[in-house]
């Protein structure tokens, strides 16, 4: 329902009057829409400042792809365990404090793409369970953020 396409149960639980006009309006109030989606993410564990995902490559001599993919998109591996199974992380990903999931994205005949998904990636998939949707929304958000002047 409305711009965020909330199910009725999500409207009841997560929709908020973010513009403080006395009513929740997910059809006409951009503030209520954005605030309600943010409230939904918060309820599912969004962690401010945590990246949604990191690039990942593989050390094929150690790669245990079946084990890495077994939990699907649920973050289940600490960095040490993730890399011990053949995932290669770089830079800030090596210091990630939480769990990671290996997210597989098929590419219609081309080799698949993989990312190391964090708890925040998982939160986005609670809104829409598709990993493709999650990555598209994340990349769109990054593009919008790049166009908005810093405050």
PLM feature segments, named:
Residues 1-100:
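Flexible, glycine-rich surface segments
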